[in-house]
Amino acid sequence: MAPGLYTDIGKKTRDLLYRDYGTHHKFTLTTCTPEGVTITAAGTRKNESVFGELQTQLKNKKLTVDVKANSESDLLTTVTVDEFGTPGLKSILSLVVPDQRSGKLELQYLHEYAGINASVGLNSNPMVNLSGVFGSKELSVGVDVAFDTATSNFTKYNAALSLTNSDLIASLHLNNHGDTLIASYYHLVKHHSNTAVGAELSHSFSRNESTLIFGSQHSLDPHTTVKARFNNYGMASALVQHEWRPKSLITISGEVDTKAIEKSTKVGLSLVLKH
C-alpha cells in the first residue's frame, strides 16, 4: 500500500488534537443538484468579525471544477484532473482573483512505495515546492522543500519519519530549517467505540521552549463523539459532536485556561446541514 503524501505524515494525531475544535460560531449548508453540482454556503463569526463563503463544485468523471467566493471579494478557482495521463497521477490548477500572482500548478503522484507532490507558481518568479515520501504504509520517510526563484534561496526544508501498525501511529518531524522538532503518536484503543488517545511534543531549539499536548476521543454511540485535550500551559478544550443525519453535524466546543477560569472560558458552535 502507498505511503501517502508528505502531508499525511502525522495527520491522524493532528486530526485528533485539532480538528473540529473552535471558539467561533459557524453555519454551513450544502445542497446537491441532480446534475452533480454541489453548492455550499457558509458563514463564520469570530469575535466581532463575520466571514461568508459560497462554493460551487462540479464533478464529471475524472474532472472536478471548484469555484469559491468569499466576503473579502476573493474568487478561488480550482480545477482537478484525476488519473492525469497515467494511474496515480493527479493535476491541480488553482487561481485566486484578483491576485494575479496566485496561480499555481500542482502534480500529485501516488505509487506503491512513494508519494510525490510538486507545485510551481504561475508567475515570473515562482515559488517551487517539492515533497516526497518513500517506503511503505508501515515505515516511511519524507522530505519537504521550497525554493524561491526570485532570491535563489531555499525557504523551507523539512523532514519526517512515520511508523504505523494496526492501531498505533508514531511520527517525527524536523521543521523550520531544523529549529523545531515535533514528535507525535496516535493509539486506537478500542475499534468498536473509536476510542483513541494521542499526544504531540514540539520543541524549539532557538527558544528552548517545549509544548506538550494530550488528547483523546470516544464515540458514545454511532452518531455521537466526544473529544478532549490539554496542554502543558494549562489550556483545556472539549467538544461533543452529533450526526443526526448523514453528513449533518452539530458540534459544541469549549476552551478554558485552567489558570484563569473565571476570565477565559470560550464556547464555539458549528452547525453543518447537508440536503
Curated annotation (Swiss-Prot):
Molecular function (Gene Ontology), one example: voltage-gated monoatomic anion channel activity
Tissue specificity remark: Highly expressed in flowers and at lower levels in roots and leaves.
Induction summary: Not induced by osmotic stress.
Domain of life where this protein originates: Eukaryota
Subcellular location per the Swiss-Prot or TrEMBL entry: Mitochondrion outer membrane
Family annotation (InterPro entries): Porin_dom_sf, Porin_Euk, Porin_Euk/Tom40
Annotated Gene3D superfamilies: Porin
Alphabetic keyword roster: Ion transport, Membrane, Mitochondrion, Mitochondrion outer membrane, Porin, Transmembrane, Transmembrane beta strand, Transport
GO cellular-component term (any): pore complex
Cited CDD domains: Porin3_VDAC
Primary role: Forms a channel through the mitochondrial outer membrane that allows diffusion of small hydrophilic molecules. The channel adopts an open conformation at low or zero membrane potential and a closed conformation at potentials above 30-40 mV. The open state has a weak anion selectivity whereas the closed state is cation-selective.
Description of its domains: Consists mainly of membrane-spanning sided beta-sheets.
Family listed: Belongs to the eukaryotic mitochondrial porin (TC 1.B.8.1) family.
Name by which UniProt lists this protein: Mitochondrial outer membrane protein porin 3
Species name: Oryza sativa subsp. japonica
